Amino acid sequence: MVSARHASYNVCFCDIDGTLVHYPEAQAKWGEITGPSVVPGCFMYVARETGRRHKVLKLPPTTTGLQGVISVKTLTELERMRRGGIKLVLITGARLSTMLTRMAFLPAADAYVCENGGRIYYPEATLTVALPIAEDMEWRRKHNATAGPPDSDAIPPSERPGTLWELYRELTAQGWSLDAFSYTTNFRLKAKDGKTAEDVARIVENLKPDLASSTNIGLADFYPATSGKEKAAQHIVEKFQSRLEEAFLLCDDDNDMGLAAVVGKVFLPSITSDSVRRAVDANPEKFVVSQKGGIIATEELLEHVEDHIGTFLLG
């Protein structure tokens, strides 16, 4: 994996869903889970093309009922990368509760970011708890005026203070299907029940200056303009005394492309949308794309990260 001698790259940002964690639809094309492994808690995934066996962990189901898997080799390679001197940051649009529920199955990291940048956590060894992490409250307070203070998390979204929740109430009154369950600095909108993608675009175009939006798996996320993956990443690299140009990214989806534009190198296990394809076509030297899929693609990328980062050339 990446070694400390490649000083030009010292931070790895890594998306979770579709990048580290893969779901049945993507996995079925490349192989199948045949049963439990001899390793406690693990299952055996057999690649269809090669017959190779991969040990995987099954994550708890998401709030939408999907159950993903992550390969043990992925976890091992990311830990080797950290030992080589690279800071690992997990960064996701998932809600806070989803990230916390999955932590026992995700790689140990140097920072954890959820809700499209709204919440940042770091390991905190002084805490004698099962999951020793502490929130970056300096970062959280930046969103207070728009998303409400942290103590408003326990208040129903329809009653929270802040511009973000004013928009939530306004869209609810207009009949939109919104998802704020367990979100604290973000809510999600889906075009259905007669609403169209054009209707969503009009909402985005008319957002107040203190709000921002991004799309993910066909859904629109809304959050404070002080948040977002790019701003969270900038905050973190400054904490690590680094720069975004010295960071690389593993990702797969629309809402990663803003961050992809500002880091030095990008690794994709798959191309999931037209916008991702356009980004790759516009700057092919920046992107490395696997020709496989699912956990096999992630493992393949991690095996070659050192060469790509060391030479800054496509494979």
Give residue spans per PLM region.
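Active-site neighborhood of HAD-like aspartate-dependent phosphohydrolases
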Residues: V2-L90, S97-T98
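Mg2+-dependent phosphoryl-transfer enzymes with acidic/Ser/Thr/Gly-rich catalytic loops
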Residues: A7, F222-Y223, E230-G315
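Short, well-ordered alpha-helix to beta-strand connector turns
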Residues: Y9, G85, A109, N116, ...
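The start of beta-strands in P-loop NTPase/AAA+ ATPase cores
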Residues: N10-C12, D110, A247
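A metal-dependent, Asp-based hydrolase signature
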Residues: H22-K58, P107-Y121, A125-T126, E159-L167, ...
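Short glycine-/acidic-enriched loop or helix-start segments at secondary-structure transitions
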Residues: Y23-P24, W30, M99-R102, P123-E124, ...
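Active-site phosphate-binding/coordination module
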Residues: L66-D179, I271
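Conserved acidic, metal-coordinating active-site core of Asp-based
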Residues: E159-V263
